[in-house]
Structure formats: C-alpha cells, structure tokens
From Swiss-Prot:
This is tRNA N6-adenosine threonylcarbamoyltransferase. Keywords: Acyltransferase, Cytoplasm, Iron, Metal-binding, Transferase, tRNA processing. Belongs to the KAE1 / TsaD family. The gene is tsaD. InterPro entries: ATPase_NBD (IPR043129), Gcp-like_dom (IPR000905), KAE1/TsaD (IPR017861), Peptidase_M22_CS (IPR017860), TsaD (IPR022450). GO terms for biological process: tRNA threonylcarbamoyladenosine modification. It comes from Synechococcus sp. (strain JA-3-3Ab). It is found in: Cytoplasm.
Length: 366
C-alpha cells in the first residue's frame, strides 16, 4: 500500500489530502483517506474575483492548519507517508510557490520523494477517485474558471488536447454574466441557482460557431448577454434575471455537451470524463448524462466536492506518477502556463536521494 500527501494551492483554495493506492499496476484505484479544503471565496468576493497577492498571503496563513487537519483525519503522521505531491503548474505563481515550498520542506525533512503535478491532470484524475473501474483511453471534458478543454487521455500520462477555448473559459463566462446581472461572486453557483427558476427558451443566444469542430468561444455569448441587458435597461424594463440566467446557461451547456459527445464519437471512445469546477453545474451534468444515455456513452462526473479544486485529485495523479517511477527533482519550479503535453518536463532525475522508485510489486512494472 502506497500513501501520499498532496498539496494544492494553485488559485484560491488551500487544500491538503492524503490518498492511497495498492502497489499494483495497471490496476489503479486511488482512495482518499482525508481531504481538507479552506476556501477563500468570502475573502475575494469583495473584489469580484481572485486577487493574486491576497490569495498567496492567505495560503501562507492557512496551509499549516490545513496540513495538520488532513494528517489528523487520515490518522497518519508524516513518517507513514511515502511521498509528497504538489501542484506546480499552471496557476497563480505566488500561490503555487506557497504550496511548492511547503512540499519541498516536507520532502527534505522527512526524506520523501517529491512529485510535481499538473493542475489539469489532477482534475482528470478526480474521475479515478469517483469511479474505481475507470481506465484510459477516455475523453476528458475539463471545464473550470480558467480552462475549457477536450482532452484525449490515451493512457496514463499521455494526453492530446482535441479542443480548447479561443477566449473566455466556461467558468469565466459564468462569472462575467453573473456580474452583469448583479448576482455576485462566484458566478457559477449563482447562475445555476437562478436558472432553476427561469425560462431557458425566452432569449435565443448565439452559440459561437467556429471552424474547428471542438474549440469553443464564449466571448460572443457574453457580449450578447451584455447587449440584451443594456437593451432592457434602456427600455426601462426590470431585468428578468432568472430567464436571462437560464437562457445563458442553456446555450453554454448545450455547446459543451454537443462538442464533447461529437469528439468522443469521432475518436471511437466509450467513456467521457467530465471534471473541473463547472462540472458541478446541475444543467451541464443533466445534459451530459442524458446525451450519454442516448448515445451509449459512459459519462463519469465526480461529485461536486471533487469537481472544484481539491488536493485529493492532485494526490491521485501523484500516485499514478509514483507508481510509474516518476518523481521530480528538488529544483522543481512553478509555471503560470504549462500544457498537458509538457508534463514529462516535470519529471527527471527524481528528488535527490529520496526520489527512489517503489519497491515490491510496483517496482516490477518498470
């Protein structure tokens, strides 16, 4: 049994988790022993969005307590943990550095391997926590505040981006439209809540047609909502917030569903994995599950607490790399941008003297 401590501080959640998996391959079924998340939503709400410097400072203040809580919940000490995983890219540089410095310190103090993890790969691995029988190949629809991508997971650690946003990410579009409607931050849950009471067919909105079949563009949709709001205000009408929210949400979720299903079919894949904060949206989940039922496509959507940023998903990805004999050097840095295809750059000679491959059953794989 391998146990791993994971740290996630890429944006405005301070998260630590302990996960474990059997030292067997390729049967990979990670389990979380603990997962603690300290959110900064209330802190940033006054600014209408995440302030990087404020986020980094709060991580510094909060991380020691979150770390202690995660270990207590797991009933383990650092001596009983086999490795330390940490998000190192992409994200806010200041926030990433807080988590990375903590992870390096623990790795050095307790002589543990260090495993850097790509944040988006972590989101994909939330699916393996939610469905123990999930195996690649599969298509990942990753929808969050900063990313909207269709990712072909060919194998563990082997990815090809099939589609991406040309402008606003889905979560970013939710936040901006919520701001236009005066609904506050974060916008996703607000739009979701108001849309339940609205008519999704009242306002036809543009879907943003592109020449690339799997890319998305939501800037036109956002602008259409802006013009609609301005027109209604100029006419002296009270804003039908619920109907606008429902119309916007229906348009965006329809686009995501159609592109994801079309891509999965084109690749001949039988499983669609949906992750990221926007995957917590009720209408998106319902549309995707219904589309999967109609097309004979298995749709795996983790529970909402695994869709939003958390450290358990980072730990799951870290365990996979650890089982594959991949660790990071202690010189590992952070990056605000890094594609999934660049993930191999995170693993080199290993974390000094403590970056050794697993023994026993896991070692036999390599």
């Amino acid at each position: 049994m391998l146990r791993l401590l994971a740290i996630e501080t890429s944006c405005d959640e301070t998260a630590v988790a302990v996960v474990e998996a059997d030292a067997a391959w390729p049967t990979f079924a990670p389990r979380q022993l603990s997962s603690v998340v300290a959110s900064q939503i209330d802190l940033h709400a006054a600014y209408g969005g995440v302030v990087p410097e404020v986020a980094a400072r709060r991580h510094v203040e909060t991380l020691p307590f979150v770390l202690e809580s995660a270990l207590q919940q797991a009933g383990l000490g650092m001596a009983e943990v086999d490795a330390v995983a940490v998000t190192c890219a992409p994200g806010l540089v200041g926030s990433l550095l807080v988590g990375l410095m903590a992870a390096k310190t623990l790795a050095l103090l307790y002589n543990k391997p260090l495993i850097g993890v790509h944040h988006l790969e972590g989101h994909l691995f939330s699916g393996f926590l939610a469905a123990a029988d999930l195996r690649p190949p599969c298509l990942g629809l990753l929808v969050s505040g900063g990313h909207t991508s269709l990712i072909w997971m060919k194998d563990y650690g082997e990815y090809q981006t099939m589609g991406r946003t040309r402008d606003d990410a889905a979560g970013e579009a939710f936040d901006k439209v919520a701001r236009l409607l005066g609904l506050g931050y974060p916008g996703g849950p607000q739009i979701d809540r108001w849309a339940q009471q609205g008519d999704p067919d009242r306002f036809p909105l543009p879907e943003g047609k592109l020449d690339h079949p799997y890319d998305t563009s939501f800037s036109g949709l956002k602008t259409a909502v802006l013009r609609l709001v301005q027109q209604l205000q100029q006419e002296g009408q009270e804003l039908p917030v619920a109907d606008i929210a429902a119309s916007f949400q229906a348009c965006l979720t329809r686009v995501l569903t159609e592109k994801a299903v079309a891509c999965a079919e084109a690749l001949g894949l039988s499983t669609l994995l949906v992750t990221g904060g926007v995957a917590a949206n009720r209408e998106l989940r319902a549309r995707l599950l219904e589309a999967g039922r109609q097309k004979g496509l298995r749709v795996v959507i983790p529970p909402p607490n695994l869709c939003t940023d958390n450290a358990a998903m980072i730990g799951a990805a870290g365990l996979c790399h650890w089982l594959r004999g991949e660790t990071s050097p202690l010189e590992l840095g952070v990056a605000s941008r890094l594609t999934l295809e660049e993930i191999p750059a995170l693993y080199g000679q290993g974390s000094g003297g403590c970056g050794q491959a697993p023994t026993g059953a896991a070692a036999a794989v390599f």
